[in-house]
Amino acid sequence: MDKNFYNESSAKNLGWDPTWFGEKYYDDQLIRAIKKWQRERGLTADGLCGPATFRRIWTERQANIDAYKPKDVKYSNYIVYNGKFHKIEWPKVVLWSEKGGLQADKGTYYNYTGRAKRNVRLFVNHWDVCLNSESCMSILNKRGISVHFLIDNDGTIYQTLDMQHGAWHAGSAKVNRASVGVEISNAYYPKYQDWYKRNGFGERPIIHGARVHGKELEPFTGFYPVQIKALKALWRTIHNSTEVEYATPLSQFGTTSKNYEQDVKYGKFNGFISHYHVSKNKIDCAGLDIKTLLEEVVDEESRGFVDIGESCKDE
C-alpha cells in the first residue's frame, strides 16, 4: 500500500490535513508523525489516518474549541417509520426535517423509498466516542456512513433518517438491512471530563471493571442518567412500532452477554443488542446492562409509568 497516497485520499474524503499532526506534506514525515500520535494513544501505529484515528484526533481537536453552544432546535413528540409518525414519550426529540435537526447525507444508507415496509428485527446500541451528537453526525457524514438516531448529552434524541431506510452503522450488510441503530454521545476517555464540566453537563460516571470479548477494559466514561432514560423511551417506541422484541443475548448465567454472538449476526435473534454482539472488533456498549434496562421498561409499561427525567421537565 502507498501510505502517502492513502493519507492524501483520506484527508480529501474526511477533511483533515497534515498540520493536524504537526506536518506540512503528505510524505514519510507525516507517516512517522501519525505513528507517533497513534502509539501515544494506544492505537495500531500504522501511520495511516483511517476512520479510527480520524475520529480520535477530531474529538481531541473539538475538546480544545471553546465555542460550543447548545443547538436551537424544534422539539417533536414522534419518530418516523416508513413515512408514518409514532408517538414517543420523551419531550426532547428532533427530526431531521425540523429546525436544528441532524440529517444523514444521501448515499450513506440503503434507500428503500417506495418499497415494502422494511422488516426491522434488531436495535443496535453504539457509543460515538464524540463530545456531542452534532460532532458525531459530522463524522458519520464525512465517513459516508449513517445511523438512525443520536442521543445527546442532555438526553435530546435526534432522528437522522426514516427507519424505513437501512443505515450503514453496524459494519455488516446483513445486520444493517435488518436493524435500526443509535449512537449515544460519550467521548469514552476520562480525560474529557473537564470538557463536560466546562460546558455545563457535569461529570460523567466512570465505569470500572467492564468486560467484553473476555477482556477487562480500562476505566471509561459512562452514560448520563438522562441519556439512559432517553434510551429506554426510544426502546419502548421502537418495540411498539417495529418487530423488535424485548430481548437481548444472554450469558449462561442469564445476564446480558458480554461477547460476540454469531446467531445474532446471522439472523437467528430478534431484540436489542450492543454493537459488540455482532462484531468481534467492537467494544460498544460495554457495561450497558440491556437485560436489566429492558426489565425496567416492561415494568414501567405495566404500571403506566413513564420517567422523562428531571432535566427534561418544565421545558
Across the structure, where does each feature detected by a protein language model lie?
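N-terminal module-boundary/linker segments of secreted carbohydrate-active enzymes
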Residues: 55-117, 122-124
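Catalytic-site microenvironment of enzymes
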Residues: 2-12, 65, 161, 286, ...
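Basic/polar, cationic surfaces and motifs that engage anionic cell-wall
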Residues: 60, 69-81, 188, 192-315
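Short acidic, glycine/serine/threonine-rich helix-capping segments at coil-helix boundaries
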Residues: 1-60
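Sec/Tat-exported extracytoplasmic proteins
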Residues: 15-18, 37-45, 61-65, 127-129, ...
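Active-site-adjacent loop/helix surface patches within enzyme catalytic domains
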Residues: 95-240, 244
